[in-house]
Amino acid sequence: MTRDIVIIGGGVIGLAIAVELKLRGTKVTVLCRDFPAAAAHAAAGMLAPDAEEITDEAMKSLCWRSRSLYPEWTSKLEDLTGLNTGYWPCGILAPVYEGQESKGVRIQENKGESPAYWLEKAVIHQYQPGLGEDVVGGWWYPEDAQVNNQALARVLWAAAESLGVELNDGITVEGLLQQQGQVVGVQTNTGIIQAEHYVLATGAWANELLPLPVTPRKGQMLRVRVPESVPELPLKRVLFGENIYIVPRRDRSIIIGATSEDVGFTPHNTPAGIQTLLQGAIRLYPQLQDYPIQEFWWGFRPATPDELPILGTSHCANLTLATGHYRNGILLAPITAALIADFIVEQKSDPLLSHFHYSRFQKQASTTPMFTHSANFSNGHAKNPPLPTLDSSLIIAGKSFHSRLMTGTGKYRSIEEMQQSVVASGCEIVTVAVRRVQTKAPGHEGLAEALDWSRIWMLPNTAGCQTAEEAIRVARLGREMAKLLGQEDNNFVKLEVIPDPKYLLPDPIGTLQAAEQLVKEGFAVLPYINADPMLAKRLEDVGCATVMPLASPIGSGQGLKTTANIQIIIENAKIPVVVDAGIGAPSEASQAMELGADALLINSAIALAQNPAAMAQAMNLATVAGRLAYLAGRMPIKTYASASSPVTGTIS
């Protein structure tokens, strides 16, 4: 039997996705190796994006959005099952000791998006009696909350079961069967299971199935209980201290956590781990030393190098990733479920997903070994090794492309030359000027029918627009044009706002204004900009799918004149950087890719060449060579010479 969707992993993330997909009418199967071992059972259930002082803007936004979903989401689950999730909007108190007063100040300065309040020593001790004597103040985060993580896991399982999700516990997935960029089945300890689409939500075990940089981070915890002799709950809000948190439950239990240990899958609690927790907790809230201990336990959180999750598309078109949530799996469950379901069912890719794509780790690689084994040589000749698997795709707004070269349709001497060049370039994205096609401008007659749009992704552009308002109108026309050509789900737009007729430099203010509106309307916006790092960051923050800084003025063929600024943009961007405009030769294309650009858009240099098709092929090869050189990592530049052969031990 072939299912619609198979979810690999039965923790909170996998189950949340399963419930959301089932509510949207799909047939869902969950494969779970060991439900009690899921990281959810080893968490504390804090919903604490403010107390955690998250500095990454995209992660902060993701966490805030997820926290805002919690009241309605848990209510829906409770209605489905009749069970209680233990959701409690109790707020979080973060006491500090002498010298820690600046802790939390970043949240306070956050433009009022999520409030935080400083409490002086007298106030905090009055607000929460029983704090340690050396607590000198603290921050109050009223919008943070908690949920009973173990109850939530049980409720999600019950909700999935009641909705008709096929739940399979005790199933070990041993491998993914892959053919031609697709997963065609999963090999399990009970046989092969097939589906149309697959979701990887295996948490700390993700690396067993794919070469993803997800590692286990062990966390030890314990639970104490408020004695019955204490008539009322002494704690009614979470205490968030330095490397310690204390989470009271309404059933009179109190969770104390958690260590963070990079020890692989080493099991069990340790005396050192428990001692560390008890010392930190008793210093923060001394009366805990008299409470009876109920239990100890441990679990494994899925950590990535940047401690951010991996969400969205993978190297296989029908495999979606949802892993690496580290400390925030419980918090991010509702937003992860919503975004993944939107992507799979509605083919909608939230711009925020691009920040958490797996390919970000390839950008960080400075070297990739090229020849590491004698198998790379045959009859004395070097064989070309394959490119790194995880670098095989360019991801824009959740859509995968193998080619990193985009081309255009303007300036060709004939439709035939344009068709030949598009094929020779190997490109998968072709940009089209909406206004010129609509008005059948010279050179654009019959353009819509000239290319095979079942193989090429159209990138409508707003060329010719001088104001933000004009660009927004043309973008809407472009979306409809793509639909007429069979690309119903195409929400891409190359945003150009260019009032300057001589140098054709984009208007930064108009571009930002148009981008903000188009993102709100659900467009994947690819803005053409001056090589301005500050503008690039602003456009990323408003949700653009890429930024497209110019190398030099459009059609000038001057090459890379903005290298320093493009490097800054690349170093700071968490969305793809596409160098656009001004590249005139393959050497310049290669240079741009060697800087670390994710892709190039080249039109004039191809269309105006004496042999456009040959130039298109040359640009394709240069793009690939530049990307490979970037991944390989160039040798360091030295002031003085360094001989390749030994300068000692010569024959005299």
Curated annotation (Swiss-Prot):
What organism does the UniProt record list as the source?
Trichormus variabilis (strain ATCC 29413 / PCC 7937) (Anabaena variabilis)
**Residues given in the record as glycine binding sites:** E52, R301, R327
Q: Keyword set for this entry?
A: Cytoplasm, FAD, Flavoprotein, Multifunctional enzyme, Oxidoreductase, Schiff base, Thiamine biosynthesis, Transferase
> Known EC number(s)?
1.4.3.19, 2.8.1.10
**Annotated compartments:** Cytoplasm
Q: Which SUPFAM superfamilies match?
A: FAD-linked reductases, C-terminal domain, FAD/NAD(P)-binding domain, ThiG-like
Gene Ontology molecular function terms on file: flavin adenine dinucleotide binding; glycine oxidase activity; thiazole synthase activity
Gene Ontology cellular component annotations, sorted alphabetically: cytoplasm
Region annotated ThiG, chain positions: 393-652
Q: Give, as in the UniProt entry, the pathway in which the protein acts.
A: Cofactor biosynthesis; thiamine diphosphate biosynthesis
Traced from the root, the source organism's taxonomic lineage reads: Bacteria, Bacillati, Cyanobacteriota, Cyanophyceae, Nostocales
Task: Give the similarity note.
Answer: In the N-terminal section; belongs to the DAO family. ThiO subfamily. In the C-terminal section; belongs to the ThiG family.
Active-site residues annotated for this sequence: K494 (schiff-base intermediate with dxp)
Q: Which Pfam families match?
A: DAO, ThiG
Where 1-deoxy-D-xylulose 5-phosphate binds, per the record, is at G555, A581, G582, N603, S604
Q: What is the stated purpose of this protein? A: Catalyzes the FAD-dependent oxidative deamination of glycine. Is essential for thiamine biosynthesis since the oxidation of glycine catalyzed by ThiO generates the glycine imine intermediate (dehydroglycine) required for the biosynthesis of the thiazole ring of thiamine pyrophosphate.
Q: What is this protein called?
A: Bifunctional protein ThiO/ThiG
Q: Which domain of life is it from?
A: Bacteria
Catalytic activity reads:
glycine + O2 + H2O = glyoxylate + H2O2 + NH4(+); [ThiS sulfur-carrier protein]-C-terminal-Gly-aminoethanethioate + 2-iminoacetate + 1-deoxy-D-xylulose 5-phosphate = [ThiS sulfur-carrier protein]-C-terminal Gly-Gly + 2-[(2R,5Z)-2-carboxy-4-methylthiazol-5(2H)-ylidene]ethyl phosphate + 2 H2O + H(+)
- Quaternary structure note: Interacts with ThiH and ThiS.
**Principal localisation:** cytoplasm
- Give start-end of the signal peptide: none
Q: What residues does FAD bind to?
A: 5-19, 44-46, 173, 325-331
Q: Which cofactor does it need?
A: FAD
Which residue stretches belong to region ThiO?
1-366
The Gene Ontology biological process annotation of the record reads: thiamine diphosphate biosynthetic process
